[in-house]
Amino acid sequence: MQTPNNNGSTDSVLPPTSAGTTPPPPLQQSTPPPQQQQQQQWQQQQQWMAAMQQYPAAAMAMMQQQQMMMYPHPQYAPYNQAAYQQHPQFQYAAYQQQQQQHHQSQQQPRGGSGGDDVKTLWVGDLLHWMDETYLHTCFSHTNEVSSVKVIRNKQTCQSEGYGFVEFLSRSAAEEALQSFSGVTMPNAEQPFRLNWASFSTGEKRASENGPDLSIFVGDLAPDVSDAVLLETFAGRYPSVKGAKVVIDSNTGRSKGYGFVRFGDENERSRAMTEMNGAFCSSRQMRVGIATPKRAAAYGQQNGSQALTLAGGHGGNGSMSDGESNNSTIFVGGLDADVTEEDLMQPFSDFGEVVSVKIPVGKGCGFVQFANRQSAEEAIGNLNGTVIGKNTVRLSWGRSPNKQWRSDSGNQWNGGYSRGQGYNNGYANQDSNMYATAAAAVPGAS
């Protein structure tokens, strides 16, 4: 092991030897040949690893002392070259894509998912305290570490359990992969879990101008994180590019739903059928198409933004500006066997539901939320999903705070009017309605 001294150079320190044994001879002062130098470095690394396993407390103290000398500032400096120092934050989607391609590479021969220019390793099963400093220390003997990044949750700043180590050369990355895979991690009771990342961390993220191939995933358990959701889908569908669990900005907790972005339309279609009702953690997922136009980016900042809902058709009627506080949703195309309790379940994921009404024999229903934002989220995410046996179509319903008149004069719930016009369970609305719904999904950027 090499440790810095007061003069800025490094001294070689070997682990304690047992009594009666002859200590190893001191290192020669002359500079050894490169091949011998590499062999000596490798032997020192092995001795260091053995010492850490035999004397974990002393090894940790030495490691902490070394870290304090190298990085006195409480915030860890990134281990990288100038280019990385200018851009210390990596894009979320790019790393999520690397994460899914790691799962894909597990089913392929080593190196099959990358090319000869890939110099980045994926490191998984990280404990919560394992940060960039820890990973850099583990691989620093190669003297070729270019950058280190541990992926963290943007809301909690806690580690997601994986990260990336980029090397200066492909050969150095290969050596680290072969040497450390399965080796017990320093100061831990678990082995290194390594694999090739899909591409170098310095490459640009893919263009977001392609088709939107996202799905909505509801009924998520509270403990499901981005990484868990990603792993659930990426293990079966190699084209998965990212996953995002929507977090309540006020509580910091999951809202119980999220999005998964695909790169292949056929796989997305398969997932909507095969994964609907499948378990993720302790709950069965409810899967449907993600209707926001840019759901692949998991929404923009909080607030209302125009989007087009799938299946929108022109019709009669309009919504005046006075309806900006309307929180009632019309649900068309309902299965005749769906009860009000069945209808309430998927909508309750998005906020407090005030009332649910299903007029007899009309093939439709109404869901009223306590606030407009919850209704907007529900429309944006549930339109075109399956409830019961049918695919439903959502639009804004009649606000119960206005007295709507109809030819028949009949109303439901003091404000649900037949004047809305039922066409086999579908309400005739003007096309502008389908552009008024807004996604209120916290941004991933």
From Swiss-Prot:
Tell me a GO cellular component: cytoplasmic stress granule
Question: Boundaries of each RRM domain copy?
Answer: 119-199, 213-292, 327-399
Give the induction text. Repressed by ozone-induced oxidative stress.
Q: SUPFAM superfamilies given for it?
A: RNA-binding domain, RBD
Output one GO MF annotation. Answer: poly(A) binding
Q: Name its cellular compartments.
A: Nucleus; Cytoplasmic granule
Q: Where is the composition biased (Pro residues)?
A: 22-35
Regarding tissue, the record states:
Expressed in leaves, stems, flowers, and seedlings.
Extract the PROSITE patterns matched here. RRM
Spans of biased composition, class Polar residues? 1-12
Which PANTHER family is this protein grouped with?
POLYADENYLATE-BINDING PROTEIN RBP47A (PTHR47640:SF31), TRNA SELENOCYSTEINE 1-ASSOCIATED PROTEIN 1-RELATED-RELATED (PTHR47640)
The protein's role, per its UniProt record: Heterogeneous nuclear ribonucleoprotein (hnRNP)-protein binding the poly(A) tail of mRNA and probably involved in some steps of pre-mRNA maturation.
Family classification: Belongs to the polyadenylate-binding RBP47 family.
Q: How does it assemble?
A: Interacts with the poly(A) tail of mRNA in nucleus.
UniProt-recorded name of the protein: Polyadenylate-binding protein RBP47A
Name of the gene encoding the protein in the UniProt record: RBP47A
